[in-house]
Amino acid sequence: MKALLFLLTLFLILPNPISAIDFIFNGFNDSSSNVSLFGIATIESKILTLTNQTSFATGRALYNRTIRTKDPITSSVLPFSTSFIFTMAPYKNTLPGHGIVFLFAPSTGINGSSSAQHLGLFNLTNNGNPSNHIFGVEFDVFANQEFSDIDANHVGIDVNSLHSVYSNTSGYWSDDGVVFKPLKLNDGRNYQVWIDYRDFVVNVTMQVAGKIRPKIPLLSTSLNLSDVVEDEMFVGFTAATGRLVQSHKILAWSFSNSNFSLSNSLITTGLPSFVLPKDSIVKAKWFVFVLVLICFLVVALVGLVLFAVVRKRLERARKRALMEDWEMEYWPHRIPYEEIESGTKGFDEKNVIGIGGNGKVYKGLLQGGVVEVAVKRISQESSDGMREFVAEISSLGRLKHRNLVSLRGWCKKEVGSFMLVYDYMENGSLDRWIFENDEKITTLSCEERIRILKGVASGILYLHEGWESKVLHRDIKASNVLLDRDMIPRLSDFGLARVHGHEQPVRTTRVVGTAGYLAPEVVKTGRASTQTDVFAYGILVLEVMCGRRPIEEGKKPLMDWVWGLMERGEILNGLDPQMMMTQGVTEVIDEAERVLQLGLLCAHPDPAKRPSMRQVVQVFEGDKAEIFEAESSEDVESWMLMKMGSRGSSREFWYGSSSHPTIEQIRLQSLSVSLSSWNSSILEGR
């Protein structure tokens, strides 16, 4: 009885013999009954071939008996060690894909799996399902974003999902752990892999077949497989192709859950090679074609270089001749190119603060990093850019007014790169303050907007009457009004400007400017005048006060919209809603209404009915004597005298006698406004 009890106790404490399994394949027999094949998997010449050139196909091979993976008493996962030699053999002139997986599966067959990026392991619906009970190590040669693959040549540990729990680029570490040497999975070479699992740690190591196993694993991670594997599982390999194809092959395989040195018995040398041979360049069919093409390209390149050199020299000579006159005549000093290049950090794109039709504008520092400037670099390939450069030098170079951007200097590089250097305007362009939603920008108040419009009017008056010659700006718009540190407006961009004698007729016939700001007569005849500048200024007034661009998709043109509001007695509804929420707007609401009326008058379609810029400035100044002296026409004097004494509501004037105002009424009311709080003289430039 004691002997029987002893034998029973011994049986319970000793490992169950059915839990131990060892097998080794140094090649596979065609008639082997130890491996079950599924899909397109075959055994050829003692090599287990999982896939071939068939597109969108799956091949799977499993050991034909289940393997106990859990201890029958403790239910803990049994350790195991497996090693195999595989190759991904590419086909000539075919892109290779997709990959191979060593796996534990609860059942045989390939049902529930898809080809291509799913590697014959899962499909679109069951990927990531805990009920899969699949553990695998993938060798993947395609980076699938949906699975968060790290690259197109990686090894990953998969648990019920193709989203690897741990992955790394395929390769191995040097024994000192300092140098990582990548291995290309699908280059046709034979690779040996070692996968060990014990004490809840998975180690994956790989190396070129025939070489010593690296000391440091490629992958090593803690992993509890208790909820993943079942008591008994099938073990083997699966691979798949898609539009990309290659042959996934297993040349040798060992597995044990008791002997971790069994892999030493694998034959790793003398194995067939599947690396594609390299064709001789001379024998290649495309060699002659490429050689002829190269010769042709060389000849063409030499011809183009010679043509470019000759053309550049002729262009340089032409431009040099063109520039000689004004270079000697105009005072703005020439700044060395090296200083400008250094100040803009080599025209770094990070310093771009604006882009115009003929070039970019960069922020820079001159005079040892002390002076902030804006550098306008005009395209050397543009004839318009050349004309713009000469125009700005010859006009803006000699103009001096507090409401015009100051030109500090210019630069003309020999190769034809033209630059204009201006004072830097810290607060950028006016349209940025009107239209951009920027936390750093506060909404301009009504009083600030009127002050800015007053300054712009002063600058335009100086151009028309205050200088030795008459200057037509021809491109007045919100983006060409810059604001300095003190929010003083400065009119900029004189690239379209033209200079004429005060008594000289204007001979422009070319339509230039910006859509929405062009006066009707410019569109019809191409002729610019001081009145076309007045028209553009009127549109600017409406734009600034209403917070709307001249032309917006799906909306009426700005001028027509404001005119309609005025006819209905609702002109105040046209004011910018953001501006109406600013502090103090009610105190200047009458002035805002009159400025809108002034804008409408300036933008009248009949140039003869528009005021001059002198009249506009005098409206802002409120100097009655100057208004009177500025006009000689008897009818103009009569309406000015009549309206200067009127302090009644403008709405009474507009709508007291008729339902629709006339342009003469607009002219009378607008030009009789007295804004007495604005008393600084702006008729002289300074």
Curated annotation (Swiss-Prot):
Keyword Nucleotide-binding in record: yes
State the source organism's domain of life.
Eukaryota
Which residues are reported to be glycosylated? N29, N34, N52, N64, N111, N123, N168, N203, N224, N259
Class of the enzyme per the UniProt entry, highest EC level: transferase
Q: Where does the signal sequence lie?
A: 1-20
Q: Where is the Protein kinase domain?
A: 347-628
Membrane-crossing ranges are 287-307
Q: Which residues lie on this side of the membrane: Extracellular?
A: 21-286
Q: What is its main location?
A: membrane
Binding positions for ATP per the UniProt entry? I353, G354, I355, G356, G357, N358, G359, K360, V361, K376
Keyword list (alphabetical) reads: ATP-binding, Cell membrane, Glycoprotein, Kinase, Lectin, Membrane, Nucleotide-binding, Receptor, Serine/threonine-protein kinase, Signal, Transferase, Transmembrane, Transmembrane helix
Which membrane topology term applies here? Answer: Single-pass type I membrane protein
Give all cystine bridges in this chain. none
Outline the segment boundaries, as ranges, of region: Legume-lectin like. 21-256
Q: Which EC numbers does the record give?
A: 2.7.11.1
One annotated GO molecular function = protein serine/threonine kinase activity
What family does this chain come from, according to its entry? In the C-terminal section; belongs to the protein kinase superfamily. Ser/Thr protein kinase family. In the N-terminal section; belongs to the leguminous lectin family.
Q: Name it.
A: L-type lectin-domain containing receptor kinase VII.1
Identify the species of origin.
Answer: Arabidopsis thaliana
